[in-house]
Amino acid sequence: MDLSCSCATGGSCTCASSCKCKEYKCTSCKKNCCSCCPMGCAKCAQGCT
């Protein structure tokens, strides 16, 4: 669990595998927001493009 995000890391999300986080809330999103958080984590997904 990332202290700045309400979701657990290690899950997967619905956006394309090539997306990156512009403004990430989770430190693990610095790598790839699509692989750091599970579905439903709006705090991570909002930074995806």
From Swiss-Prot:
- Region ranges (Alpha): 30-49
Q: Which residues bind a divalent metal cation 4?
A: C33, C34, C44, C48
Domain of life, per lineage: Eukaryota
GO terms assigned for molecular function = metal ion binding
Q: Keyword Lipid metabolism, does the record have it? A: no
Keywords of the record: Metal-binding, Metal-thiolate cluster
Q: Does the keyword Secreted apply?
A: no
InterPro entries hit by this protein: Metalthion_dom_sf, Metalthion_dom_sf_vert, Metalthion_vert
Q: Which GO terms describe its biological process?
A: cellular response to cadmium ion; cellular response to copper ion; cellular response to zinc ion; detoxification of copper ion; intracellular zinc ion homeostasis
Q: Which SUPFAM superfamilies match?
A: Metallothionein
Which family does the similarity line name?
Answer: Belongs to the metallothionein superfamily. Type 1 family.
Q: What is its biological role?
A: Metallothioneins have a high content of cysteine residues that bind various heavy metals.
Q: Could you tell me what this protein is called?
A: Putative metallothionein MT1DP
Q: Which organism is it from?
A: Homo sapiens (Human)
- As recorded in Swiss-Prot or TrEMBL, the protein's gene is named MT1DP
